[in-house]
UniProtKB/Swiss-Prot annotation:
Main location: virion
InterPro entries registered for this protein in UniProt: Pox_virus_G9/A16
Gene source species: Vaccinia virus (strain Ankara) (VACV)
Lineage top rank: taxon: Viruses
Virion surface side: 1-111
Protein family: Belongs to the poxviridae A16/G9/J5 family.
Top-level taxonomy: Viruses, Varidnaviria, Bamfordvirae, Nucleocytoviricota, Pokkesviricetes
Biological function: Envelope protein part of the entry-fusion complex responsible for the virus membrane fusion with host cell membrane during virus entry. Also plays a role in cell-cell fusion (syncytium formation).
Protein name: Protein J5
Membrane-spanning segments: 112-132
Compartment(s) where it occurs, according to its Swiss-Prot or TrEMBL record: Virion membrane
UniProt xrefs under Pfam families: Pox_G9-A16 (PF03003)
Length: 133
């Protein structure tokens, strides 16, 4: 399709998922502004194989230097100390490692002196200082 045909189709079908890269929601554009990363570099409809993209947008997308990673936790089992992590970042490394599991330190350490005695102690200290100086 030519750029004119793409724009004509998307003008008539703004809610079509294939046109969402040309007409994204305002919230998507705002996220792009806030992160200082153009929305077309990370917005999923722009990555679709059937997305309708004019030539200028295709050119801009090729200049994106973003690694789009999807990391998901798979089988998490505390009893077997096993953690499967699925990393989809164009890397081919697959590692299965056993992780040592230990309980958190949950000891409660109480102060030596109760906090309610602090003002009385400070007052007594001030009286002693005033009495001797």
């Amino acid at each position: 399709m030519t750029d004119e045909q793409i724009y004509a189709f998307c003008d008539a079908n703004k809610d079509d998922i294939r046109c969402k890269c040309i007409y994204p929601d305002k919230s998507i554009v705002r996220i792009g502004i806030d992160t200082r990363l153009p929305y077309y570099c990370w917005y999923e409809p722009c990555k679709r194989s059937d997305a309708l993209l004019p030539a200028s947008l295709k050119k801009n997308i090729t200049k994106c230097n973003v690694s789009d990673c999807t990391i998901s936790l798979g089988n998490v089992s505390i009893t077997d100390s096993k953690l499967d992590v699925n990393n989809v970042c164009d890397s081919k490394r697959v590692a299965t490692e056993n992780i040592a599991v230990r309980y958190l330190n949950q000891e409660i350490r109480y102060p030596i002196i109760d906090i309610k005695w602090l003002p009385i102690g400070l007052l007594a200290l001030a009286i002693l200082i005033l009495a001797f100086f």
